[in-house]
Amino acid sequence: MTALTLPEDIRQQEPSALLYTLVSAYLEHTAQTGDESLSCLSDDQHTLTAFCYLDSQVEEGGFVQLIASGYGEYIFRNPLADSLRRWKIKAVPKVLDKAKALYEQHGKTIETLADGGADIPSLRKQFPEFEEWDGAYYEAAEQDLPLLAEHIQSNWETFAHIGQA
């Protein structure tokens, strides 16, 4: 098991900084070890990583950007929502369920248009139905980030070490 190199004050950081600092350490570790598939990460660490990808993409450009950037399958076809529910996180998974239905309808089209060079603002105009869930996500994330940080703090060893015990 490998202890991550983390800032001394990491456990005192505000919730989003705590989450993003951990995921940054995971990605740095996997880059250094050549583990491009992130296979050394535990299920909980994968969940946290997926959440941070979700959060960064949706906060920047909504679900359309998440899909156009190629993260749709990673977020919607993996058990992220169910894993968050197991952590007692409720608001974000509800939004993910609604956005997933739109992804199933429009995901391939958005990905194809993005691969063809369409920019995010024009894609957002073409798929305005995602806007409602973008707004719902912003509210849900604000509510759930402290709960995520609390879960991480309560299970610190699970998140601060990589590899098998």
Curated annotation (Swiss-Prot):
It comes from Neisseria meningitidis serogroup B (strain ATCC BAA-335 / MC58). The dimer exhibits a double-stranded DNA-like negative charge distribution on its surface, which facilitates interaction with DNA-binding proteins. This is DNA mimic protein DMP19. Acts as a DNA mimic. Interacts with DNA-binding proteins and prevents their binding to DNA by occupying the DNA binding sites on the proteins, acting as a competitive inhibitor. DMP19 is a bifunctional DNA mimic protein involved in controlling nucleoid formation as well as gene regulation. This bifunctionality depends on different oligomeric states. The monomeric form interacts with the DNA-binding protein HU, which prevents HU from binding to DNA and forming nucleoids. Activity can be modulated in vitro by crown ethers, which are small cyclic polyethers that can modify protein surface behavior dramatically by stabilizing either intra- or intermolecular interactions, thereby probably altering the protein's tertiary and quaternary structure. Monomer. Homodimer. The monomeric form of DMP19 interacts with the DNA-binding protein HU homodimer with 1:1 stoichiometry. The dimeric form of DMP19 interacts with the Neisseria hypothetical transcription factor (NHTF) dimer. Pfam families: DMP19. Belongs to the DMP19-like protein family. It comes from the Bacteria.
